[in-house]
Amino acid sequence: EIMPSLVGSEMCIRDRKKRRLNMNTGFIKVSAVSPRVTVANVEKNLQNALKTVKAESESGSSLIVFPELYLTAYTCGDLFLQDALIQSALDALIKFSKETAYSDAVICIGLPLRVSSRLYNCAAVLQSGAILGIVPKTYIPNYNEYYEKRWFASSEKVNCSSVIIDDEEVPFGSNLLFTLSSGAVLGVEICEDLWVPVPPSSELCLNGADIIANLSASNEAVTKNDYRKNIISVQSAKCFCAYVYASSGVGESSTDLVFSGACTIAENGAILSESERFAFDGSSASAFIDFEKLNSERVRNGSFSDNNEILRENDFTVIPAYVNEAEYDNVKRSFYPYPFVPSNESERELRCGEILSIQSAGLAKRLAHTGLKKAVIGISGGLDSTLALLVAVKAMEMLSLPNENIICVTMPGFGTTDMTYNNAVELIKALNTTFKEIDIKPACLRHMSDIGHDSDIHDITYENTQARERTQILMDISNKVGGILVGTGDLSELALGWCTYNADHMSMYGVNCSVPKTLVRHLVRFEAEKLGGEIEQILLRVLATPVSPELLPPDENGNIKQKTEDKLGPYEVHDFYLYYFLRFGTKPQKLLFMASRAFSGKYSEEQLKEWLRLFIKRFFISQFKRSCLPDGPKVGSVSLSPRGDFRMPSDAEFTEWLKF
């Protein structure tokens, strides 16, 4: 029998030399494993566990999680009341610890342990030949097919804080946390603990854990797998944590139940990896956890901190168990290149419909509030103004107002091409909106003459003269007809400062202000497919048009010469940077690594590095434009509204962000 330590509540934790981390990448490789298990054959299970640790350690795993009661098997029944089985499990744990001393990985393995005349269902946490701690199960199921209270006591019955195993004092309790790195902390719970309304993992996370290991023995039943994955996913989302779940496999007794060896790894609501089920030779799942992203989520979510302050307990014991973070080259994790756009087609369609509803409802509310019944939009034949027009049409429908109440103004300038002009005119007429055309060239020439600027010098003054002339016209028409000037600029342009201050930067309500360029395309395409016919053909031509402000004259063939992406780089790359930079505060070196994976084979690392530098510089120097943005609706998790989502001084330096 394991006796409680005489130390009582005072924890004597052995001195452990803190390992020097090889790299501050923010990634840790974790594995949930369910090797072949044999009921009551401890030696065979031990050997399988040793083989598994060797394989996982060689693959670079820093955390290896076995199933519940793995050393004995979960389905031993009343054999748990036999001294021979309990002693064999303890002996196996000691041997397992010594024979895995070569591994720096933190290992969680399940076994029954008797302490002070009570039997506990436990998870042992080991590293480098040392047993770091023993965590007993808290919630002991005793319903339906479960009869665990027949054998096991809850951690609530524990009356000691450490035990002696192999002449070493080992922390014992459900209040243990294990530091894996400078930013990652491990907490442990067992099977049923997850299925209660307030799992121990919630408390563990509030006290600092951001990776949860669950050693489980979850039998299969129809629909149970989906439900199980759902609660794993939801718990990881609620707690902003990674969840590493390993369940017993088909080697368990099939007298009444069948176990599948389900292994699942989730991170902040997303399933990163899951194993094959019902594999006779065992199963496993591995993933690279981005704990820096989890920490960022917690820092940004005020309610998590509030919950922490209200419910946090102060009697948790933190045990050092430092592991190496994965080097970037070894991180086997892919990154979807379009984080603003769902990869699944059906989900993408639902998202597009919802975003358009948010945009149009925002505009409709503003019109209703002001009592104005008309909307004024400058239509260029490009993507952004096209989307704004489609939103305005839906807003009018909400308000039961005719499309004629949308005043569409096309304002040809020095860079306007026949292609964009025709797209604009045809779309305005096809949607039955009110068409108005004003040639801005005479006014711009007069203005440049007034300020003494040579109109043959095509510099920033030449370009911005046109942009501000257009905005002045639109503002005045709005006053004249009693309407709202609808802004067309998108989130990507705001991030890069690709707008003229007090020109297209300004409006009375900006419907696209939190829609990035990559998403604008999908929204327009979604509406094209929905509307069909002539309108669809016009919208498809708009989608095929290069992105351009058209402020410089066309080439000799009348085609667009000034192409935005030739100057800035691809919007798909900038949107990728924008999402992770704002959403998670991702550091530039890591951002470059992620982009290299996301756009592998499409852009070189040198190109991505050049565009990242450009993104950072333009993002910082353009904050003054974002500090005075018009109102506009937030549609997703990333927004640059100075009133809500993003507050930054306009004169901040970007030097620290260029150190990569």
Tell what function each PLM region has:
Residues 13, 71, 196, 442-445, ...:
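Active-site micro-motifs of SAM-dependent methyltransferase domains
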Residues 1-15:
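Single conserved hydrophobic/aromatic residue that forms the stacking wall/gate
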Residues 4, 288-290, 439:
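Helix N-cap / beta->alpha transition motif
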Residues 18-378, 394-403, 435:
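Enzyme catalytic cores with a strong preference for nitrogen-chemistry domains
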